[in-house]
Amino acid sequence: TVTALNVTDTAIILLNGQYGVEVGTQNHFRYTEKLNKPVIFLVNQLDNEKCDYDNILEQLKEAYGSKVVPIQYPIATGPGFNALIDVLLMKKYSWKPEGGAPTIEDIPAEEMDKAMEMHKALVEAAAENDEGLMEKFFEQDSLTEDEMREGIRKGLIARGMFPVFCVCGGKDMGVRRLMEFLGNVVPFVSEMPKVENTDGKEVAPDVNGPESLYFFKTSVEPHIGEVSYFKVMSGKVREGDDLLN
């Protein structure tokens, strides 16, 4: 886990919908603290009969405080799970029993009060991470969708916000929306604090900079021999390049 986090830009901590916060959850979170990585919590197995999403949210808030902010909530959990409310986009996502591409609709009237309450909490949490957004929030009591995304991005960078998503991974329900969020909202590597090399010098993530690689794993594969895995921290690496450590 620690090895993977060293080459990860944003960590997604997966929670089993049956059990919520476990020892592994706490250990993984501590690793992200040490490495100063942004964190997203992801609750899976919403179709399990023992899943209690509201209780899991309470567990997360008890463990990690008010920085835990849900982006989504399921309308119902258990074997009949097939819909959730996204309080960033303020839309209902629903699926056919086999999952796949969602149907996106307006939020039904019976869910609007809960959705608005969670939306306002998300707006406030997003505003807290940017002085300009906070001023606008105080003046208008709202933010645009793009402003919310920017506030969430800054909150992730500063570890001032831990968004919560929910999925039923086995049926491909919610996964595509999560991937969309990762593409549109999570911080770019260029926005994150600079890393240092073994000489204590900062390494800027510049494609035109000097070649700098971080080797994070070496394994021995049958019929191949040693295989090393690395992340390019700066510069470019091409097949056949000779690199000096």
Annotate each language-model stretch with its function.
Residues T1-N245:
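Structural and coupling elements of P-loop NTPases
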